[in-house]
């Protein structure tokens, strides 16, 4: 529902212009991986923060870097894992920079953003809901990975099923 022809992320990647977004989903559903893939698909300076280990000074430093990036025509993409762990004042620090386009924010959360992310930030971001992959989807991904590694014939279907079950 997020990827594929005429889906929001596909349009953003094709236009090389990401919108600020909040990725909401359970642990292990691919929020961080998706953010890294998006960063790799656009020409932006990518920075990743954990709301658990980062504070306002880290953000101020990044905003200064983003200003220097802007002067040379470089966009700045900021990924904040566990954005719901920032308090309201910390989340407020993003607002002027998201509004001005100085940064593009991708926040990841396992919590309902309607309750954990401040409304002004939500209104300037697109909320994308990620769902965990089911066993068949995981097996398909594993098969694809094994093909690219030329190891597909050495792994039994039972082993693939077992690996897929371990991911839950």
Language model feature labels by segment:
Residues 95-98, 112-126, 143:
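Short regulatory helix/loop adjacent to the ATP-binding pocket of P-loop NTPases
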Residues 44-47, 118-132:
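A short helix-turn-beta junction within AAA+ P-loop NTPase domains corresponding to the substrate/partner-engaging
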Residues 19, 71-77, 100-106, 126:
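Loop/turn-to-beta-strand initiation segments
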């Amino acid at each position: 529902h997020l990827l594929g022809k005429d889906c929001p992320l596909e349009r953003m990647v094709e236009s090389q212009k990401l919108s600020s977004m909040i990725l909401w989903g359970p642990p292990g559903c691919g929020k961080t991986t998706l953010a890294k893939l998006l960063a790799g698909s656009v020409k932006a300076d990518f920075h990743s923060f954990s709301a658990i280990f980062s504070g306002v000074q880290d953000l101020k430093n990044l905003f200064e870097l983003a200003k220097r990036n802007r002067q040379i025509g470089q966009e700045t993409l900021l990924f904040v894992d566990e954005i719901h762990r920032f308090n309201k004042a910390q989340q407020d620090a993003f607002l002027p920079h998201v509004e001005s386009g100085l940064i593009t924010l991708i926040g990841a959360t396992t919590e309902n953003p309607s309750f954990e992310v401040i409304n002004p930030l939500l209104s300037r971001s697109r909320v994308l809901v990620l769902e965990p992959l089911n066993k068949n989807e995981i097996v398909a991904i594993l098969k694809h990975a094994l093909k690219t590694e030329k190891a597909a014939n050495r792994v039994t279907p039972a082993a693939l099923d077992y690996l897929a079950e371990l991911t839950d």
